[in-house]
Amino acid sequence: MKDFLPAFWAVIPAAGIGARMAADRPKQYLSLGGLTILEHSLLCFLDHPRLKGLVISLAVDDPYWAALPCAHDTRIQRVDGGSERSGSVLNALLHLHAQGASDNDWVLVHDAARPNLARSDLDNLLGELADDPVGGLLAVPARDTLKRADSSGRVLETVDRSLVWQAFTPQMFRLGALHRALADSLVSNVSITDEASAIEWAGQSPRLIEGRSDNIKVTRPEDLEWLRQRRSEFGR
């Protein structure tokens, strides 16, 4: 009998340049513990038995990818990235559809510069959302006091942090639903900052799955220094 259980795919949008790092190359190709940030971001998925494959969206003129050992891994499929994150993810989804993936399959979108994803967080996300009608994302409840500001940088009010979460990745949604949400938002010229915001715009409510706070995205030089120090301390 044919198995109709949905498959799980990973998508890594990696076409950005990370200008705030002020580095000589895109931040995903900076070194962290003997590997690039991007390689660390990929490994958690490549080592997971439930993942069927991985699609990475890269800049058309990317000169760094081909030199990495993982570029020759048959589990990884490369597509061209877009000018924005949403376009890069959409190109990966189009590729999955072209390869015969089902609308009912799950897609986990993960930041290329988020190299510290714990296996336990990935396992928990898969376990909690595999039967969810919408999908969801790893997130962390806000810890610090939050202020809403006006355009001049002055405080308007203090925000109730008990209702605020910081969105992380992976973000996990059905292939068909995410494809439609991203495509429709692009046609409507809606600003989409992550996959969850596209699903929200489509009228759905993604579920928040609490993850580890050290699953940080490398955005500024101090983020990378923190990760290097942490890996040095824990021998990773």
UniProtKB/Swiss-Prot annotation:
GO terms for molecular function: 2-C-methyl-D-erythritol 4-phosphate cytidylyltransferase activity. Keywords: Isoprene biosynthesis, Nucleotidyltransferase, Transferase. This is 2-C-methyl-D-erythritol 4-phosphate cytidylyltransferase. Pfam families: IspD. It comes from Pseudomonas syringae pv. syringae (strain B728a). Belongs to the IspD/TarI cytidylyltransferase family. IspD subfamily. Transmembrane segments: none annotated. The keyword Lipoprotein does not apply.
